[in-house]
UniProtKB/Swiss-Prot annotation:
Belongs to the SHMT family. It is an enzyme of class 2 (transferase). Its EC number is 2.1.2.1. Keywords: Amino-acid biosynthesis, Cytoplasm, One-carbon metabolism, Pyridoxal phosphate, Transferase. One of its GO terms (cellular component) is cytosol. The gene is glyA. (6S)-5,6,7,8-tetrahydrofolate binds at L120, G124, H125, L126. The modification N6-(pyridoxal phosphate)lysine is found at K229. This is Serine hydroxymethyltransferase.
């Protein structure tokens, strides 16, 4: 028989931990650039009976019966993703951005081929060729980086390395780069050397959808993204491509690297895409950028150095070396004060990845809560106070109290506490 007890009775320990996490999110300042708060509608879709259904294959071509409803769900997600980004084809089945990237590589290259990608040390992602990741183990990775003069991507170096190494794939994208990515310039380099252009827009997908960042879809053979972060959907992946690549790309997801798709998550993706197609989403993205610029100015006024001097998107990197702090110390001190950030490598970082010399800060989650430039000035001041006295328990406690007061003005998930 089916267990019918609600979660609080069926598993009080998990129920309590969920309440604790919800309270942590509601009472703290979430500044991790890759995190956001999904809508109740997205969560409702993820918790639906769609989680029960196996559906190997694609709409209309399944290996299981009973897929007539999930076919409609998945097709809605596909159609909405295509409309949102102006793409010819969309695959909504990737369980994550990493799996989306894996499928993109396998669709365009074979193990041992050369891939030109942004170095993790300069803001790239693990799946862009880190030696500890599948991408670095299966492919010959040639990394590119930044100019020391302004800490922006060295496009001359990208062109030089492309001509020298003739990569099969030119991967563009970053997990910690605060400036605009000029996809047209990358596309020109890729064409010159006969490389396929792949763009990982995981961090900036929401900005792209709102027209606040250049769209890579017209320039790239394949575009990958997560569906959370600025897109504000469930945790998952998405691939966009041209119709000419659709068949081979689909086969790399299933049966290549995945089995059954998560139709409850795909439904949540569809809901998020629907939300992103509304005019209010464009205004939300505009506010993300406005808040990021206000936060950046506030951090500079607090005496903090920002990599590249500021931001064009939703995130910024703070160099803590002038404060004689590591990223690890900064993250821990801010965490005690109720401000969540992540330690992050900065360009030419002398520290190890688990220590780092910087922190990464972003505004998507606080913008979802309704905070604006005025609150960003306050947040910047709070961050500055903590980083000026990271070991002072009185300062930490005082800031923690102010954080709670600020968060109380922008309540969230109250029915779940």
């Amino acid at each position: 028989m089916m267990p019918t007890k609600p979660l609080a009775e069926a598993d009080p320990q998990i129920a309590q931990l969920i309440r604790e996490e919800t309270r942590r999110q509601a009472e703290g300042l979430e500044l991790i650039a890759s995190e956001n708060f999904v809508s109740p509608a997205v969560m409702e879709a993820m918790g639906s009976t769609l989680t029960n259904k196996y559906a190997e294959g694609y709409p209309g071509k399944r290996y299981y019966g009973g897929c007539e409803v999930v076919d409609k769900v998945e097709q809605l997600a596909i159609d909405r993703a295509k409309q949102l980004f102006g793409a010819e084809h969309a695959n909504v089945q990737p369980h994550s951005g990493s799996q989306a990237n894996m499928a993109a590589y396998f669709a365009l290259a074979t193990p041992g081929d050369t891939v030109l990608a942004m170095s993790l040390n300069f803001g790239g992602h693990l799946t862009h060729g880190s030696p500890v990741n599948f991408s670095g183990k299966l492919f010959k990775i040639v990394p590119y980086g930044l100019k020391q003069s302004d800490e922006t991507i060295d496009m001359d170096e990208v062109a030089r390395l492309a001509r020298e190494h003739r990569p099969k794939v030119l991967m563009v994208g970053a997990s910690a780069y605060p400036r605009t990515l000029h996809f047209d310039r990358f596309a020109g380099i890729a064409r010159e050397v006969g490389a396929a252009l792949v763009v990982d827009m995981a961090h900036i997908a929401g900005l792209v959808a709102a027209g606040l960042h250049p769209n890579p879809v017209p320039h790239a053979e394949i575009v990958t993204t997560t569906t959370h972060k600025t897109l504000r959907g469930p945790r998952g992946g998405l691939i966009l491509t041209r119709e000419a690549h659709a068949k081979v790309l689909n086969s790399q997801i299933f049966p290549g690297i995945q089995g059954g798709p998560l139709e409850h998550v795909i439904a949540a993706k569809a809901v998020a895409f629907h939300e992103a197609l509304q005019p209010s989403f464009k205004e939300y993205q505009r506010r993300i950028v406005e808040n990021a610029q206000a936060l950046a100015e506030g951090l500079k006024e607090a005496g903090l150095r920002l990599v590249s001097g500021g931001t064009d998107n939703h995130l910024m990197l703070v160099d803590l070396r002038p404060k004689k702090l590591t990223g690890k110390i900064g993250e821990e001190a801010l965490g005690k004060a109720g401000i969540t950030v992540n330690k992050n490598m900065i360009p030419w970082d002398p520290e190890k990845p688990m220590t780092t010399s910087g922190i990464r800060v972003g505004t998507p989650a606080l913008t979802t809560r309704g905070m604006g430039p005025g609150e960003m000035a306050t947040v910047a001041s709070l961050i500055g106070r903590v980083l000026d006295a990271p070991a002072d328990e009185k300062v930490i406690a005082a800031v923690r109290g102010e954080v709670r007061e600020l968060c109380a003005q922008f309540p969230m998930y109250q029915d779940r506490l």
